[in-house]
Every structure is written in structure tokens, then in C-alpha cells.
């Protein structure tokens, strides 16, 4: 049986995108990677919200963790007898944080958890609030390591895998979700080849994922997003492994734009499709993917690469950031609570209630 203790974390888990210093939040600026390693320092909640919206920090779990620390920063100048009274003053800041990225359910989940903490806290509410943010981060790291072992256990030795976007340490408290499974699979000699799609338009695969794997000494092969179907046809890939920003009650999964087409291609070519995400990403109140708000970003993000314009003036662009993969195209959903094979409303309820 695979366990998280089988993995050499000194080798496979040393990148940290979020650092709480005690009076400020340091965020590794993921817009500048891989060529510039630089941190943005946030001193208040509005700076955290701006960093989330600007993709300084990204990845659903990391967004939730950053938002939790944003609440701690917002509380610094608030004077209140207990947490419930403090919450009344903090609510505008929480709403601004919540509006920074609407699709990722982890953001709303983390803020709801901070609200519950405040409502239950007495005069020591500031200390309780900081401890809650720290707990969210620590629990995410532990969950990622456990998911890594669970997901790796599904993969046969010698397999090739394809991943999309960035789901590693940069997107979480550490180790990663889908990339955590890949790290665990490499450590246990189950995965022989790793392929990563470039992930237009922000190139999270090209800029972040292959860089992360390089830091761990894992060889990865970058492909154009449009090459994925042909890669599967060659037989080089046995699993597509992705993360999630929201998982619905029927297994429908919102993730980075381009995920849906990978799932369609995988099913056509007999390639297995795995979604890896913490249970905080599961939204049992959302019945199916049709109810998910899909974030639309500035069309200008499609007009160039690396600051160089590649498109003629006067061209329209459509730039949804996420798409929804139907649950029937997913072979396994892996959370820290366990593995759901071939997700349906029934086995999702059995795993998560609702």
C-alpha cells in the first residue's frame, strides 16, 4: 500500500509560494517565473485581493490560503470585544477578497471558514484568526501529500502521464495536487515519462510546471496544447492528471481552459483521466457544471506572448479562463478523503454527503 511516508520530501517538496512573516504576506510572483524569482509583499487585505486577481498567486488551494491570510491582515486595525463584532467590521474586506477570483470554490470555502472562526471566538479572536489561517495552510500540505500517495497507487509502473496548467507547490501550500501525484509516482518509480501542455494564454505549464519539475530533478517534456491528441494516439500517455477549481455534486469539474478537450481526447484514445483536488474544492451545493460561473478575463491576454504582440489590431478575442469537464469523462477523482472511481451523483454523495 502506498503511503505519504514512502516519499523523499527533502527532494520532492521544497517550493513554497506563500510565506507569512508575522506582519505581512509574501507571495512568490508567479507572473515572472521562471526567469525572475521575486516576492510581492502584501501589507493589507486589498493588496492580497489585487494579487489574487492579477495572478501573482494562482491555483485554487493557494488562492484560498492567501485569502485567509488576507483576513488576518484586514483584522490588524480592527478593535472589537469578540470575533462576532469584529466580523461586522471585516465583512467588506471579506467580500472584496471573495470577488477577486469567482470560479475557485476554495476561495469562498476559506473565507467561510474564517467567518466561522470569528463567530465562535471571544476576546482572543485575533490570535484565533491567525491560528485558523495557519491551520488551513498546514492541512492543505498534509492533504496534498496524502492525495499524492492515493493517486500514484492508481498508476501502473512504466506509465506516461500528461498534465495541464500548474497544480504543484506553486498552486498550493506545497507538494501539489495533480503534480503531487506525479511527484509521488516518480518517487515510487511508477511514472516513466511526464508531458506538460504549455497552457495558453498564461503558459502556466510552460512557465511553471516544467520549472517546478526541473527543481526536483524530474525530466518533463513540454508540448503545444494542440499536440495532446496526437501524443495520446502514439501510446506515450496512459493517464491525464489534472487539478480542479470546482467539483460539482455530480462530478462535473471546472478547471483551466483546455481541460475539457483533453478529457474528450483521452476517452477517444483509451487514456485514463484523473482529477486531483482537496475536498475543499468539492461543492456539493452546485448540482452540475451548468451552474458554475466561468471567469472571463481581458481579451488582450490572447494578443501576444511575453509582452510581444502577435495579433493584428482590430481582432476580437474570447478568453474564458476555465471550462467544465463532464463527470462521465472522468475515471477517478482523488481527494484526501479517498478515491471516487467513475464519479456519479450517488458515489459523490456517499463520499461527501449532501
Swiss-Prot record:
Keywords carried by this UniProt record: Amino-acid biosynthesis, Isomerase, Methionine biosynthesis
UniProt pathway: Amino-acid biosynthesis; L-methionine biosynthesis via salvage pathway; L-methionine from S-methyl-5-thio-alpha-D-ribose 1-phosphate: step 1/6
Residues at the site labelled Transition state stabilizer: 165
EC number(s) stated in the UniProt entry for this protein: 5.3.1.23
Binding site for substrate: 58-60, 101, 204, 255-256
Keyword Glycoprotein attributed: no
Gene: mtnA
Protein name: Methylthioribose-1-phosphate isomerase
Pfam families to which the protein is assigned, alphabetical: IF-2B (PF01008)
Function: Catalyzes the interconversion of methylthioribose-1-phosphate (MTR-1-P) into methylthioribulose-1-phosphate (MTRu-1-P).
Residues of the active site: 245
Catalytic reaction list: 5-(methylsulfanyl)-alpha-D-ribose 1-phosphate = 5-(methylsulfanyl)-D-ribulose 1-phosphate
GO BP annotations listed: L-methionine salvage from methylthioadenosine
